Amino acid sequence: MSGRQDASHAGRARARMVERLRAQGIQDEGALAAMMQVPRHLFVEEGLAYSAYDDTALPIGFQQTISQPYVVARMIELLRSGGRQLGRVLEIGAGCGYQAAVLSTLATEVYAVERIRPLLDKARANLRPLRLPNVRLKHADGTLGLPEAAPFESIIVAAAAGGVPNALKEQLAPGGRLIIPVGGGEQRLLLIERQGNVFRESGYEAVRFVPLLAGTE
C-alpha cells in the first residue's frame, strides 16, 4: 500500500471513530474536530496500528496505556462545557503524547508532564513529525504539578488518584477547571471548578485508568 493510500485508509478510520464518538453522546464539535485532526495511529505500537481507531485503551509500554478515544473526548468536553476555552493546559501523564496533540489544537499552550523518562522520550519522538509549537514536555512528578509554569486555566489528569492532589488545585487559575479520575477499584471522573478560593466538585461517569504515582523514573 502506498503512503497516500495508507493515509487515506487512516483518515477514513479516523472519521468512523469520530462518528462513533458522536453516536456515543459526545456533542463538543471542537473536541470531535481535534480528534479528527490528530492521527492516533502514529502514537500506538506498530503491531497495534490496526486497532488505533477502535474505542479502546491500548498498551504503550511501561505498564501504561493510551486512553480510549471516548474518554479523551469526554474529558475535553467536560473541560470546555458551557462554551469555555481551554487556555493554558497542564496535562498530567503525557504517556505517548496523543492527548497532548489533541489538546494542542484547542489550547493556547499545553504543558505535558510525564514521570517515566523513556515514555517521555517516546512521546517527544511521536510528536516531532507533527511540529506542534504550543506543546511543551516535562519529565517531572505529576502529583506536584508544574509550579514554575502555573497557573493553568485547565488541568487534565490521565491517571487515577485516591484524592485530588492539593498541588494541582493550587495551580488552577481562578475560574479554571480540573478533570481527574478518582478512586481505586471503582473510579469516576471528577470535575473541579475554582471560584476564588472555593473548589466546586461534580462527579461524572465511571472510568478505568492506571494509578497516579509519585516520583519519577
UniProtKB/Swiss-Prot annotation:
| GO CC aspect terms | cytoplasm
Recorded protein name is Protein-L-isoaspartate O-methyltransferase
The entry sums up its family as follows:
Belongs to the methyltransferase superfamily. L-isoaspartyl/D-aspartyl protein methyltransferase family.
- What Gene Ontology molecular function terms does this protein carry? protein-L-isoaspartate (D-aspartate) O-methyltransferase activity
What keywords sit in the KW lines? Cytoplasm, Methyltransferase, S-adenosyl-L-methionine, Transferase
Which residue positions are annotated as catalytic?
S67
InterPro entries documented for this protein:
PCMT (IPR000682), SAM-dependent_MTases_sf (IPR029063)
Q: What does this protein do?
A: Catalyzes the methyl esterification of L-isoaspartyl residues in peptides and proteins that result from spontaneous decomposition of normal L-aspartyl and L-asparaginyl residues. It plays a role in the repair and/or degradation of damaged proteins.
Instruction: Write out the catalysed reaction.
Output: [protein]-L-isoaspartate + S-adenosyl-L-methionine = [protein]-L-isoaspartate alpha-methyl ester + S-adenosyl-L-homocysteine
Subcellular location field: Cytoplasm
